[in-house]
Regions:
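Alpha-helical DNA-contacting segments of helix-turn-helix folds
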Residues: 65-71
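Short hydrophobic/aromatic patch on the recognition helix
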Residues: 46-57
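Basic, helix-initiating cap at the start of DNA-binding domains
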Residues: 1-32, 36-45, 62-65
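Hydrophobic alpha-helical connector segments
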Residues: 66, 80-108, 159-163
Length: 199
């Protein structure tokens, strides 16, 4: 006789519903954009009721914010994973930046993070989510390069803010001119790096 599957707890069912909504919304927002995706389409894709969406998130905007946070978290993990393959702090910084720019060309990141994020949430709320995932790791990478003598010493956090803003703009520009955006970022990074005779 087949053994019965253990019944899921209410908490497990709730988490499964929430995850299904986030997964469905992520795919649809990446494909159609926030404004082109009615809530009914999300719940249909997720296989849940409209009541479940409003119970877990309150409204479509709150669902979008959860989607944005999940996409940003995956992006930060990708950047960190790419950076870890570098042999020294500077190479890790370069590899992380390159991975960030590659990701910005993908529909999920481009549409959800760069385009709809600021317009749906407003710049301040979007920036809090975006910087929350990327600012301190970028500042830490810069600080490591400074300690290694590869970047002139200065407060790393303000420098990270400027560089993150430049990367966001480069990600937006990449759709029209990916090579030009990548070249601009490489040029910017070369200006940060100290020449061997300056060390």
């Amino acid at each position: 006789m087949l053994s019965k599957q253990p019944r899921r707890t209410q908490r497990e069912r709730s988490e499964a519903t929430r995850s299904a909504l986030v997964a469905a919304a992520t795919a649809l927002f990446a494909e159609r954009g926030f404004h082109g995706t009615p809530a009914e389409l999300v719940v249909g894709r997720a296989g849940v009721t409209s009541g479940a969406l409003y119970h877990h998130f309150g409204d479509k905007r709150a669902l979008f914010k959860s989607v944005l946070d999940a996409v940003e978290q995956r992006l930060a993990q990708r950047v960190a994973s790419a950076a870890r393959t570098g042999e020294d702090p500077w190479q890790r910084l370069e590899l992380g930046v390159a991975e960030y720019l590659r990701a910005c060309a993908e529909p999920e990141v481009r549409r959800i993070v760069l385009l709809d994020g600021p317009s749906v949430l407003g710049w301040e709320e979007w920036h809090a989510v975006d910087a929350g995932h990327h600012l301190r790791p970028l500042a830490a990478a810069l600080a490591a390069s400074m300690r290694a003598g590869q970047v002139d010493r200065r407060p790393p956090l303000p420098l990270a803010r400027v560089l993150l803003g430049a990367l966001t703009e480069a990600g937006l520009a990449a759709e029209e001119d990916a090579e030009g955006a990548q070249d601009a970022v490489r040029w910017l990074l070369t200006r940060l790096r100290r020449r061997p005779d300056d060390r």
